[in-house]
Curated annotation (Swiss-Prot):
The gene is trmFO. SUPFAM superfamilies: FAD/NAD(P)-binding domain (SSF51905). One of its GO terms (biological process) is tRNA methylation. Belongs to the MnmG family. TrmFO subfamily. This is Methylenetetrahydrofolate--tRNA-(uracil-5-)-methyltransferase TrmFO. It is found in: Cytoplasm.
């Protein structure tokens, strides 16, 4: 029997959830409020618009948890990964995309799908119970009326953190007599050559002057949001500078793995990297340079960077507030709201962090909804998989800071990482049986974790097809 499943929100999570529902033969109705109502971060009415970076991060499925997540999503027929692969741009070992082409591909695929209906307009308040099963994937910029409805239903306050956007520079305004193309350690990646980033070097004097300017620069006022924490994975560059004069050169401006071909014997104190932002190669974004500086200060301070003295900005950085649920308290293991099980949540509003993670949670929300509609609930995903580890963190991670009833909540937005995976039962050893140490141990451990994940996902998929739970693979 065909089921109508409503999806509120047409971002990465909502788009992926709708695709999974539609591909399973059910009807997906996407409710997207743009362009009827905009947000402080979105610029278009396209589905799956990327509002921050254009990078999906590492595409390495052997040594990186997000690369493994890419692989798992591809194996489950992810629309988001298909569109990313089709619209990739050079980015070293990362998977980066032409943001406009990517959004257009997702929008086109959903608009043309016979099982998808796209409704433009805001859902004011909670979805009506008459809708039946519904997936709420409204993201970190959930409209006030819906956010208030969620709070009223759950009796819980959503937590919040700031998110900052990095500037984008016109390629032809970058001084190529100063900057050079190189990926860190010359590492190639999907669609790349090993020389995919533009690098702008700084001497010690230039770096110290730049850091001082960041600290002293005029910032956007945000008194109404005081006390709201930042997510460490998206700290504004000036906040990093305020943490200490050496923070940036050991973070986004680290010079390791890069050599200036014009002066190969002199090691820069720091390097600013820019990554291709569109397929034409005409736009580059400043890697790690999310900011809450005022627009005029951004232009002044960022033009202090060697090679960017005459930079023309296609987009300046900005600041917005993100909100997310206390998901371990509010959601069950299949992302249903305990207070109203007909509602599922997906994407960043659940407390995952990152484009790929948001889409991954949307993928699983769609599959959970389809399985429930068919009367064949899915077995829990093995936590040994990237998808399972992410869902387990969202639905079961960190209820209390110290276990006390009145303690503050410690649940925070999280990127997928190997720390979310169950430990291996046996420490990795080499071919001779010797226990390993250092980098060799770390590399082999990651390989063992990814091998286990692939085996366990294959068993889970077989069980899902058979409609029965299967045991996890042996270590």
């Amino acid at each position: 029997m065909t089921q109508i499943i409503h999806i509120v929100g047409g971002g990465l999570a909502g788009s992926e959830a709708a695709w999974q529902v539609a591909e399973a033969g059910h009807r997906a109705v996407i409710h997207e409020m743009r362009p009827v109502r905009g947000t402080e971060a979105h610029r278009t009415d396209g589905l799956a618009e990327l509002v921050c970076s254009n990078s999906f991060r590492s595409d390495d499925p052997e040594g990186n948890a997000v690369g493994l997540l890419h692989q798992e999503m591809r194996s489950l027929g992810s629309l988001i990964m298909r569109a990313a692969d089709t619209n990739q741009v050079p980015a070293g070992g990362a998977l980066a995309v032409d943001r406009e082409g990517f959004s257009a591909a997702v929008t086109r695929a959903l608009e043309q799908h016979p099982n998808v209906t796209l409704v433009r307009g805001e859902v004011e308040g909670l979805p009506p119970e008459a809708w039946g099963p519904c997936i709420v994937a409204t993201g970190p910029l959930t409209a006030p009326a819906l956010a208030e409805g969620i709070r009223g239903l759950t009796g819980a306050e959503s937590l919040a953190f700031f998110d900052a956007i990095a500037p984008i520079v016109h390629r032809d305004s970058i001084d190529m007599d100063v900057a050079w193309f190189q990926s860190r350690y010359d590492k190639p990646g999907p669609g790349g050559t090993g020389a995919d980033y533009l690098n702008c070097p700084m001497s010690r004097e230039q770096y110290d002057t730049f850091v001082a300017a960041l600290v002293a620069g005029e910032k956007i006022g945000f008194k109404q949001w005081e006390g709201t924490p930042y997510f460490d994975g998206c700290l504004p560059v000036e906040v990093m500078a305020e943490r200490g004069p050496e923070t940036l050169r050991h973070g986004p401006m680290k010079p390791v793995g890069l050599t200036n071909p014009r002066d190969p014997l002199v090691k820069p104190c720091a390097i600013v990297q820019l990554r291709q932002d569109n397929a034409l190669g005409t736009l580059y974004n400043m890697v790690g340079f999310q900011t809450k500086l005022t627009y005029s200060e951004q232009v002044r301070i960022f033009r202090m960077i060697p090679g960017l003295e005459r930079a023309e900005f296609a987009r300046l950085g900005g600041l917005h507030r993100n909100t997310y649920l206390d998901s371990p308290r509010l959601l069950d293991a299949t992302l249903r709201l305990r207070a109203r099980p007909s509602l599922r949540f997906a994407g960043q509003i659940t407390g995952c962090e990152g484009y790929v993670e948001s889409a991954a949670v949307g993928l699983m929300a769609g599959r959970f909804a389809v399985a429930e509609a068919a009367g064949r609930p899915l077995a829990p995903l093995p936590q040994s998989t990237a998808l399972g580890a992410l869902i387990a963190h969202i639905t079961g991670g960190h209820l209390m800071a110290d276990g006390e009833a009145n303690a503050p909540r410690s649940f925070q937005p999280m990127n997928v990482n190997f720390g979310l995976f169950p430990p291996l039962e046996r420490a990795p050893r080499n071919e001779t049986g010797r226990r390993l140490r250092g980098p060799e141990k770390a590399a082999l451990k990651k390989r063992a974790l990814t091998d286990r994940a692939r085996a366990d996902l294959a068993l889970w998929l077989e069980g899902a097809r058979d409609g029965a739970a299967r045991p996890a693979a042996a270590e």
